[in-house]
């Protein structure tokens, strides 16, 4: 977005906020669900990776930071390689991702209280999409990842996680 477009958007938002009748202000971005905050561990026995193989260990830690969430993903692969991916994000905007060469940005979209989608991109091109669903009992989470490859097999992973702590450093 260019400077002129950015200024126009800021002016439009400021105008809408000051001219809306009291009690009818523009809606704030959706808040991140409390269900997400905590530590989640890969349940490899329930997970499926196509074409595979997936990581042998993975822990996802989600921490609330103001209105945003900090996501920390730590993985160990069968060949011993380790990966640590980090991002701070909220809904409806693109945020930078660190720790992987596969994608450099994430855009989150809230579907409902327990479901959200993420578009992962690299250099402005979509790398893949992930749909995260937290179970109603808040004890498990499923992430379905899809990526269409132009040169090789497409990717379709259904990955299950068990909540192991409500907050980092605390048992469930």
Where are these regions (language model features)?
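Bacterial N-terminal signal peptides
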Residues: 8-17
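Hydrophobic small-molecule pocket/channel-lining residues, especially in calycin-type beta-barrels
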Residues: 23-172
């Amino acid at each position: 977005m260019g400077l002129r477009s950015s200024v126009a958007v800021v002016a439009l938002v400021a105008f809408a906020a000051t001219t809306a009748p009291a009690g009818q202000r523009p809606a704030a971005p959706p808040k991140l669900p409390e269900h997400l905050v905590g530590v989640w561990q890969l349940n490899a026995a329930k997970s499926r990776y196509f074409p595979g193989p997936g990581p042998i260990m993975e822990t996802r830690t989600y921490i609330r930071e103001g209105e945003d969430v900090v996501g920390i993903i730590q993985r160990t692969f069968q060949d011993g390689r380790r990966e640590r991916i980090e991002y701070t994000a909220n809904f409806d905007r693109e945020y930078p991702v660190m720790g992987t060469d596969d994608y450099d940005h994430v855009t989150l979209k809230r579907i409902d209280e327990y479901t959200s989608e993420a578009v992962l991109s690299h250099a402005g091109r979509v790398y893949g999409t992930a749909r995260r669903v937290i179970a109603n009992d808040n004890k498990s989470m499923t992430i379905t990842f899809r990526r269409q490859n132009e040169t090789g097999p497409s990717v379709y992973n259904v990955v299950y996680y068990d909540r192991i702590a409500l907050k980092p450093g605390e048992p469930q």
